[in-house]
């Protein structure tokens, strides 16, 4: 089963009949329009390309306009692709709604995390701070040694250091589907998902469900 592209609306909570509060993220999933179907013969793999939302006419480039027109769909805010499993078929111009998640219990949600700018090792990698006193001068939040000696004489790749934090692709796995509201194009999942309000999200059935 393929996934769908939605938009993060925000967080709220809903109550069960027993009065238990469940924190949920509201994801708006407008109908995903199929812009292209890729086949084994033409492209070397099976996939479906979709768009969603809308884009101002003066923001659509000519190549994009031609691509959307060929599929017979309105220009959307982007293009996303999902690998197509055997036995599932779609046609260009087809619309896929949030109802495909009606029988799904858990989902994986992918988004772009909030950017935190340049962060030190304490914030970025949870390094411990050094002594506040005992002769420590101006080295309370520095990482300490980053290497060994003349051998190997270099800093190894992947060393945890200060640098840009956030604004990267993040996936949260196996979130419970609490409610599917087909009338309002909403999907409610338990817990938090990556990114800021209004950010694009890719929602797929959980691989570990």
UniProtKB/Swiss-Prot annotation:
The keyword Iron-sulfur does not apply. Methylated by PrmB. InterPro entries: Ribosomal_uL3, Ribosomal_uL3_bac/org-type, Ribosomal_uL3_CS, Transl_B-barrel_sf. Residues 133-152 are annotated as: Disordered. It comes from the Bacteria. Signal peptide: none annotated. Keywords: Methylation, Ribonucleoprotein, Ribosomal protein, RNA-binding, rRNA-binding. GO terms for biological process: translation. The modification N5-methylglutamine is found at residue 150. GO terms for molecular function: rRNA binding; structural constituent of ribosome. GO terms for cellular component: cytosolic large ribosomal subunit. Coiled coil: none annotated. Part of the 50S ribosomal subunit. Forms a cluster with proteins L14 and L19. One of the primary rRNA binding proteins, it binds directly near the 3'-end of the 23S rRNA, where it nucleates assembly of the 50S subunit. Belongs to the universal ribosomal protein uL3 family. This is Large ribosomal subunit protein uL3. It comes from Yersinia pestis.
């Amino acid at each position: 089963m393929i996934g769908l592209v939605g938009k993060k609306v925000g967080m709220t909570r809903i109550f069960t009949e027993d009065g238990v509060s469940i924190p949920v993220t509201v994801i708006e999933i407008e109908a995903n329009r199929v812009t292209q179907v890729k086949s084994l013969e033409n492209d070397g793999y099976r996939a479906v390309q979709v768009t969603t939302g809308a884009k101002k006419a003066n923001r659509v480039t000519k190549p994009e306009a031609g691509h959307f027109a060929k599929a017979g769909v309105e220009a959307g805010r982007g293009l996303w692709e999902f690998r197509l499993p055997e036995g599932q078929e779609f046609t260009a111009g087809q619309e896929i709604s949030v109802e495909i998640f009606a029988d799904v219990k858990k989902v994986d949600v992918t988004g772009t995390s909030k950017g935190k700018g340049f962060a030190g090792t304490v914030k970025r990698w949870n390094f411990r701070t050094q002594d506040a006193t005992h002769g420590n001068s101006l080295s309370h939040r520095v990482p300490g040694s980053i290497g060994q000696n003349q051998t190997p004489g270099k800093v190894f790749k992947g060393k945890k250091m200060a640098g840009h934090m956030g604004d990267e692709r993040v996936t949260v796995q196996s979130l419970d589907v609490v409610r599917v509201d087909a009338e309002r194009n909403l999907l409610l999942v338990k817990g938090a998902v990556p990114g800021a309000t209004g950010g694009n999200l890719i929602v797929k059935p959980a691989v570990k469900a």
